[in-house]
């Protein structure tokens, strides 16, 4: 019975985005984006990406990142910033890249939060 309850709780958390695959570091992500010359990858679907994305971001879904990353980021020690809708898919992509040996992967979390933080920084 406890095992079933635990599974239900984990399922609910996963569906709300509260159980994330990787730790979100939005502040560091924004800092590197503002410095420029940092690879930014939107891991959402092509349809989501077409609806709006950060300027200069590439679109590689979290399901395709392992196959496509070396073509855009051959240096495994260079910073790579990931984001998605909630931070969950970018967390999954972060874990994938770290398993492939990438050392500076930052899960910047949700696009809408990044956009709001950028606007706040510009208005100061």
Task: Show where each model-derived region lies.
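Rhodanese-like catalytic fold shared by cysteine-dependent sulfurtransferases
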Residues: 2-4, 17-38, 47-79, 88-124
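Structural scaffold elements adjacent to functional motifs in cytosolic proteins
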Residues: 40-42
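Bacterial N-terminal signal peptides
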Residues: 7-17
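Short, surface-exposed ligand- or partner-binding patches at beta-edge/loop junctions that are enriched
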Residues: 83
